[in-house]
Amino acid sequence: MTAIETDTPSNKVKEDESTDLRKDREKKKRSRVKQLLADIAKQVDFWFGDVNLHKDRFLREQIEKTRDGYIDISLLASFNKMKKITTDSKLIARAVKNSSVVEINLSGTKIRRRFPLGEKPQDVDSRTVYVELLPKNVTHSWIERVFGKYGMVVYVSIPRYKSTGDPKGFAFIEFETQEQAAKAIEVLNNPPEEAPRKAGMFPKTVKNKHLPPVEVTEHSITEGCGTEEKKKKKKKKSKARKDSVEKAEEDTKEQDMDIISEGVPKRRKTVSESSVPDVQEADKQTAKKEKKKKERAESFDQSEKVRQGKRKCSSSEEHDCSSAKQKKSDTKDLPQDEKPMVTQEVLQECKELSTEEEKDAVDKKEISVPKVKRKRKKKHKERHRVGEEVIPLRVLSKTEWLVLKAEYLTLQRASMASLKKSMSEMNHISEEEMQTQPSMQSFDIKNGKVETVKNEPLGPQFVCGVIGKITSSDPLQGRKYVKDAFSGVCEVVYVDMLEGDTECHVRFKSPEDAQTAVKTRSDLQGKHNWKLQILAGDNEQRYWQKILVDRQAKLNRPREKKRGTEKLIAKAEKMRLAKTQEASKHIRFSDGF
């Protein structure tokens, strides 16, 4: 019985601990789910809100397709932003259960707006601001945090490049009222000095790929980023100067201490304590020390002039020092046995002088160091305050931006017109050249008007005995390699092969070229291990039929349509490349020059 009684309380304690742990886990799960549900509800309410639906054509069309306005929740789960949060349709339905914007059907699989969508407001442009010079990695949350201080931000649009997905460097922010937009423009319109004077960013592209913009990092958002680096450099220089001055002070102190120690005569040694060679070595060392001291004194003469708090010796101290030096010189002249013993009074005086100097220097350092630290801290705080308040952005109303856009479009049209004119002048062929070259156009007169009809270029015409077949034991290296092999013997028009093939067809310019190639068959066999055969009869006709079929398939292949400015710019680019190739050609002079 005693064993049972002792076990029961411990079991109860364990059960209590386990229940506490379960409660803690449940609490943690609830907090996470609450945040998740709040994020889902916020996103869905935004999608079905008036501001977004007036701009989101895809979602508006999906709602208009249905008779009752319901759309599947699975469609919302397929959106990229919702994928980052969750893909569970049931969790989405649970999140928007108590929403004031949307409602769910009885089965919990479809969702719709509670109230029908009204007409689009007319004052959207006046409530919208345009902002440029944004950082490269700008996000919606960053814009909401910066612009949300001056009003309720209802919509943020960050245009991005299709090719890379990078932001274009500008954005449009819609506020709830016009007053909030005007306040944001007044406070946040602080463009840096390096920025262009005229506002309006219209990014340029080359072959549907944007030119790399100027990188603006997070550090460049706060004002005075470059000035901070300069100040840091100045601080480093000032620190180095202070360190050099302090070193000079320490060296001068050591020098003074050495002079005092030199003024004090050394204790007399007996014959048993030191030998004669030891004394000679000691004299050499003292001579070296004196030389070093003289060099130090000369190098730090300038620093001693600038240095404040320099110790000035009184007449009594100078007298003591000079007397000590005289004593030292006298003792040097005397033999070692006759040197007098140093009194305790002289040693105490020297110690007192050194301690007074050290105290003065320490007091000066204690006074100067805290002042410098305080100044640095104040500057650092002021810098942070400036960085929080001032952001180098250019902000203006969307109505002003639309005016700039119209100006840009007129300039673009004018430049395109001048480009067309210059291209037509370049493509214009003179009458003399037209007479020399065969005309590719036929003229048709209808109703008194002359219409030009372009004759389509014909394909390769059938010529007997110009097709050769090459077979190799190893994969062929390429078309250029095959052409180069025949270059010294005959002229090759086309090589029909794919990469890695062991067989290929060669079309020669004339039957005579084909016959000359056959004559060099043995050379090709020995050098390249190729077998050459000229096609004839049915094999030749089948191959010519294949040529025509391949050509027709190539002509009927769907091409990427280019219209407007893209087509014009592509033509101009081709002409520019042709010009550069002509200019890069070598000029060949005759032997006479």
Swiss-Prot record:
One of its GO terms (cellular component) is nucleus. It is found in: Nucleus, Nucleoplasm. One of its GO terms (molecular function) is 7SK snRNA binding. Its main location: nucleus. The keyword Transport does not apply. It holds the Pfam family La. GO terms for biological process: box C/D sno(s)RNA 3'-end processing; cell differentiation; mRNA processing; positive regulation of protein localization to Cajal body; positive regulation of snRNA transcription by RNA polymerase II; regulation of mRNA splicing, via spliceosome; RNA splicing; spermatogenesis. Residues 127-205 form the RRM domain. It comes from the Eukaryota. Residues 1-11 have a biased composition (Polar residues). Keywords: Differentiation, mRNA processing, mRNA splicing, Nucleus, RNA-binding, Spermatogenesis, Transcription, Transcription regulation. Residues 461-574 form the xRRM domain. Residues 248-259 have a biased composition (Acidic residues). Residues 231-240 have a biased composition (Basic residues). Residues 30-121 form the HTH La-type RNA-binding domain. Residues 1-28, 191-363 are annotated as: Disordered. RNA-binding protein that specifically binds distinct small nuclear RNA (snRNAs) and regulates their processing and function. Specifically binds the 7SK snRNA (7SK RNA) and acts as a core component of the 7SK ribonucleoprotein (RNP) complex, thereby acting as a negative regulator of transcription elongation by RNA polymerase II. The 7SK RNP complex sequesters the positive transcription elongation factor b (P-TEFb) in a large inactive 7SK RNP complex preventing RNA polymerase II phosphorylation and subsequent transcriptional elongation. PANTHER family: LA-RELATED PROTEIN 7, LUPUS LA PROTEIN-RELATED. Core component of the 7SK RNP complex. Associates with box C/D small nucleolar ribonucleoprotein (snoRNP) complexes. This is La-related protein 7. It comes from Xenopus tropicalis.
